[in-house]
Structures are given as structure tokens and as C-alpha cells.
């Protein structure tokens, strides 16, 4: 059976830390969607590991790790991240696999991603993309013109010629769309010719891999990337990523039936952050937001961009919970709220004098809602590293209880500091 870790807000909730904790007791860690546009840091002892595309399960020497067919793979970044982990002492090569059905991200995807963003910026419609080529790759995938891993590593004698044909067809289509932008197609093609043999040992049929693991009753953890509010269907479209980041993406990205899922863990920051553009109802463009940003060290691992900060939004969380069906929650970075005398929580939206019954799909509505807040007392004491739930200050426990009661989902873990060990189990 599979347990799943999913981001419940707009990403950067601290999923990697929970995955790291759970990885101590699992045998397979899988990524189902996204690419190297994700980013999180895991600290083991005094060593810090930055992950973008590769599964966090690599920190566990006994855990196998796989990128599923829903993931899009930029091969140079794949090997760069792998080498960086190996330099820090992780033995990864015999424990890391890539789906033969995963689509490839090329440099021209990244180049056109930035060109597209520049176009949108001129019209003041910027999405705030990471520029990693994720959107253009999913676009070519959806248009059935993309190139998959098996196209690159196939042993068929005509495979390389077919790969080149597919590649030039894609490049030509980008030139037609964006003009003769600066890009060396020949040089990239030569690099991929070398990658053919280097990548081959990592490539597997991911559907067969996952179903064999299930049949063998292995303990499996699926590591979600990004978060529900960035989902292509259910997020704040168009300010979203280009893949299914919710529970649906787990099934389609790994070829799993719903019956394979046992637990769905929603990871929730004790306040709310967002990177890039898009509506953010509880955002605090004031001293509160700056304080959260400063204490929480809210800077993106992948982009280095400052994260926008605001109060916890339980309207977002109610919506996220309904879609993903969390069986329990991990509240992270509770310690960031230690110095607040009062803490606000968004509990409903009002639009033109009427309370909304659900999270609105229309961004023109979302941009103009008034957030209805409940104000709770802070605890104003340092909780860093507390190991027992009962040792938390009374007001901290009340804050967590309020979240549980509102969402009707139990909290199982609470993050009380940045260290790997700073996570208590309720």
C-alpha cells in the first residue's frame, strides 16, 4: 500500500521534512509529477541536502527511488542534482530509477518558457514561472509531439534517427512560434547522444516497478511536488503549474489504482506563503508579512525569490481537504508564530456583501473578496525543538485544535523548528 505526502497550500510547506521522517521506515519513494521546478531542503545532522527533481528518499540508504511517468525530466539537471548529492556522501546510483514514459525537458523548452514569460510581462499578465521549461514540456506532451525517455534510450537501430527527427520537429515549431531565438540545437543534440548510454541504467517501466512493489508488500511513499493550489485544474488558474499536483496526479503519474492508496498526508504551513504571481487573499503587505518572511526565512530553494506571506487561510485548506481527502495533517513552522501576541486565521470569504459557500474559481472574484478572520491569542514563548504535544503552550494547542475542528481532520505531526529532529508526533 502507498502513503502519500501532498502540499495543501501553494507549495513550500515543508513536505520534504515529513518525507524524510517517513523515509526511515519505507522501501520505495516515488515522485509522480512536476520536474526540477520544485525545491526543498533536508538537513541530516550538519549536512544540508537540496532537492529539486529527485525523490527525498535518497537520504535513506535502504530506500529505492523512482521518477514516475508524470514527471518531466531535464537530463542535465538530473545528473547535476545526482552529483551534488553524491558529493555530500549519498550513494544514489543503484537506488534511483526513471520511468521510460516520462517526458524530456530540453534547453529550448526552458528558453521558450522565459520568452513566454517575457511576453506576458509586457502585457502585465506574468505567471511567475520558474523558467525551468516545465510548462512548455507539458504543452508538447499534451499536443502529442513530446519526446519520452524511451525514445532516447531505445536499442532499436533506427531509434537515434527517429529521436533526431522528433527533436528537430519540436525545435522548428518553437522557431515558428518565437522567431530565431538564440539557441544551439546541434550542441544540445550532441549532449543527448552522450546521455543515451549514461541514462540507460536508470530507466525502468515505472508501472511494472510500482505494481511489483505493491505485490511484494513493500512500504511505499509517494512524494507530491508543488501543492494543490498550484494544480492545473484545481489551483488558481492560470497562476498554477502545468501538472496535476493533487491526489489525481498521484494515480495518473504513477499508474496506480485508487485502491493502492492507504493514507494521504496534507502538509500545511502554520501560516500561508506563495511564490510568484496570483491572488493571495490572506497576504499581509505590512509588518506582519515582513515578520513572517524574516523569521520563517521565506526564500525559494529553486528560485531564491522572496515568498509572499500571510495568515493561515482555512478557506483554502477546506477546499484542498475536500479534493485530496487528507487522512491526517502535518502542521509545519509553528515556531515561526512564537512572538506574535495575536494570530489571525481566515475562515470565510465575503464578496459584495455575501459570504461565499466555497472557494471561487473566478479570479476576479478571488481578488476582491474580504477575508473574515478569527483572532486567536498567541503563546509568546519559544517552542523550538519541543518533542511532546502536551509540552506545547496552551495557546499553541488551542491554535492547532481550532485547525483540526475547522477541517475535521486530525493533526498527526507538528513542526517546531528547522532541524530534522524538530518535529513532534501528536
Curated annotation (Swiss-Prot):
Q: Does the keyword Plastid apply?
A: no
Instruction: Enumerate the cofactors the protein uses.
Output: Mg(2+)
- From the UniProt record, which GO molecular function terms apply? adenylosuccinate synthase activity; GTP binding; magnesium ion binding
Task: List the catalysed reactions.
Answer: IMP + L-aspartate + GTP = N(6)-(1,2-dicarboxyethyl)-AMP + GDP + phosphate + 2 H(+)
Q: Where in the cell is it found?
A: Cytoplasm
Ligand binding (GTP): 11-17, 39-41, 307, 333-335, 415-417
The active site of this protein is located at 12 (proton acceptor), 40 (proton donor)
**GO biological process terms held by the UniProt record:** 'de novo' AMP biosynthetic process; IMP metabolic process
Give one Pfam hit by family name.
Adenylsucc_synt
Q: Where does IMP bind?
A: 12-15, 37-40, 130, 144, 226, 241, 305
Q: Per UniProt, where does substrate bind?
A: 301-307
- Its Enzyme Commission number? 6.3.4.4
Q: What class of enzyme is it?
A: ligase
Q: In which pathway does it act?
A: Purine metabolism; AMP biosynthesis via de novo pathway; AMP from IMP: step 1/2
Family the entry assigns = Belongs to the adenylosuccinate synthetase family.
Record-linked HAMAP family: Adenylosucc_synth (MF_00011)
Subunit composition and interactions: Homodimer.
Identification of the protein by name: Adenylosuccinate synthetase
Please name the source species: Meyerozyma guilliermondii (strain ATCC 6260 / CBS 566 / DSM 6381 / JCM 1539 / NBRC 10279 / NRRL Y-324)
Amino acid at each position: 500500500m502507498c502513503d502519500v505526502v501532498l502540499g495543501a497550500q501553494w507549495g513550500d510547506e515543508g513536505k520534504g521534512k515529513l518525507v524524510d521522517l517517513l523515509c526511515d521506515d519505507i522501501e520505495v519513494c516515488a515522485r509522480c509529477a512536476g520536474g526540477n521546478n520544485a525545491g526543498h531542503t533536508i538537513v541530516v545532522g550538519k549536512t544540508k541536502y537540496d532537492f529539486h527533481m529527485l525523490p527525498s528518499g535518497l537520504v535513506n540508504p535502504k530506500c529505492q527511488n523512482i521518477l514516475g511517468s508524470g514527471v518531466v525530466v531535464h537530463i542535465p539537471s538530473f545528473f547535476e542534482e545526482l552529483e551534488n548529492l553524491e558529493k555530500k556522501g549519498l550513494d544514489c546510483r543503484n537506488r534511483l530509477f526513471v520511468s521510460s514514459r516520462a517526458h524530456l525537458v530540453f534547453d529550448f523548452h526552458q528558453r521558450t518558457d522565459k520568452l513566454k514569460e517575457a511576453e506576458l510581462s509586457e502585457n502585465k499578465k506574468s505567471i511567475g514561472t520558474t523558467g525551468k521549461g516545465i510548462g512548455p514540456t507539458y504543452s508538447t506532451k499534451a499536443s502529442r509531439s513530446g519526446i519520452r525517455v524511451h525514445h532516447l534510450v531505445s536499442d532499436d537501430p533506427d531509434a537515434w534517427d527517429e529521436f533526431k527527427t522528433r527533436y528537430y520537429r519540436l525545435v522548428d515549431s518553437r522557431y515558428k512560434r518565437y522567431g530565431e531565438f538564440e539557441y544551439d540545437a546541434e550542441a544540445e543534440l550532441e549532449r543527448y547522444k552522450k546521455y543515451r548510454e549514461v541514462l540507460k541504467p536508470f530507466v525502468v517501466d515505472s508501472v511494472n516497478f510500482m505494481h511489483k512493489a505493491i505485490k511484494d508488500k513493500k512500504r511505499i511513499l509517494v512524494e507530491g511536488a508543488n501543492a494543490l493550489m498550484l494544480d492545473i485544474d484545481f489551483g488558481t488558474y492560470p497562476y498554477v503549474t502545468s501538472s496535476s499536483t493533487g491526489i489525481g496526479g498521484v494515480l495518473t503519474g504513477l499508474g496506480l489504482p485508487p485502491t493502492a492508496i492507504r493514507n494521504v498526508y496534507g502538509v500545511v504551513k502554520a501560516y500561508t506563503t506563495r511564490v510568484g504571481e496570483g491572488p493571495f487573499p490572506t497576504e499581509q503587505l505590512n509588518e506582519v508579512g515582513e515578520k513572517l518572511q524574516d523569521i520563517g526565512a521565506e526564500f525559494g530553494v529553486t528560485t531564491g525569490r522572496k515568498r509572499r506571506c500571510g495568515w493561515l487561510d482555512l478557506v483554502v485548506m477546506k477546499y484542498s481537504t475536500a479534493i485530496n481527502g487528507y487522512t491526517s495533517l502535518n502542521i509545519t513552522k509553528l515556531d515561526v508564530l512564537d512572538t506574535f501576541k495575536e494570530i489571525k486565521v481566515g475562515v470565510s470569504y465575503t464578496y459584495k456583501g455575501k459570504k461565499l459557500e466555497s472557494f471561487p474559481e473566478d479570479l476576479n472574484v478571488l481578488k476582491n473578496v474580504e477575508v473574515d478572520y478569527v483572532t486567536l491569542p498567541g503563546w509568546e514563548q519559544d517552542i523550538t525543538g519541543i518533542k511532546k504535544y502536551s509540552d506545547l503552550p496552551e495557546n499553541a494547542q488551542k491554535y492547532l485544535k481550532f485547525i483540526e475542528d475547522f477541517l475535521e481532520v486530525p493533526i498527526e505531526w507538528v513542526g517546531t523548528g528547522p532541524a530534522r529532529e524538530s518535529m513532534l508526533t501528536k
